From Swiss-Prot:
The keyword Coiled coil does not apply. Inhibits trypsin, chymotrypsin, plasmin and factor XIIa. Does not inhibit factor Xa, thrombin, human plasma kallikrein, porcine pancreatic kallikrein and human urinary kallikrein. Exists as a dimer in its native form. It comes from Amburana cearensis (Cerejeira). GO terms for cellular component: extracellular region. Keywords: Disulfide bond, Protease inhibitor, Serine protease inhibitor. The record marks 14-15 as: Reactive bond for trypsin. Pfam families: Bowman-Birk_leg (PF00228). CDD domains: BBI. This is Bowman-birk type proteinase inhibitor 2. The record marks 41-42 as: Reactive bond for chymotrypsin. Belongs to the Bowman-Birk serine protease inhibitor family.
Length: 63
């Protein structure tokens, strides 16, 4: 899998139906490719987090 493929190691979902899930991963310099609302710090390297709310979790990045 490429590093740009959407994936998430730390995903949390609500128990509602449909669930509301978000990824808490911190990535360097960019968010995953499927992220629409990405926020990054101004540090070098930048630490970025995706703030999208989805009804599923992406597959884990590691393993």
């Amino acid at each position: 899998s490429s590093k740009w493929e959407a994936c998430c190691d730390r995903c949390a979902c609500t128990k509602s139906i449909p669930p509301q899930c978000h990824c808490a991963d911190i990535r360097l310099n960019s968010c995953h490719s499927a992220c629409e609302s990405c926020a990054c710090t101004h540090s070098i390297p930048a630490q970025c987090r995706c703030f999208d709310i989805t009804d599923f979790c992406y597959k884990p990045c590691s393993g």
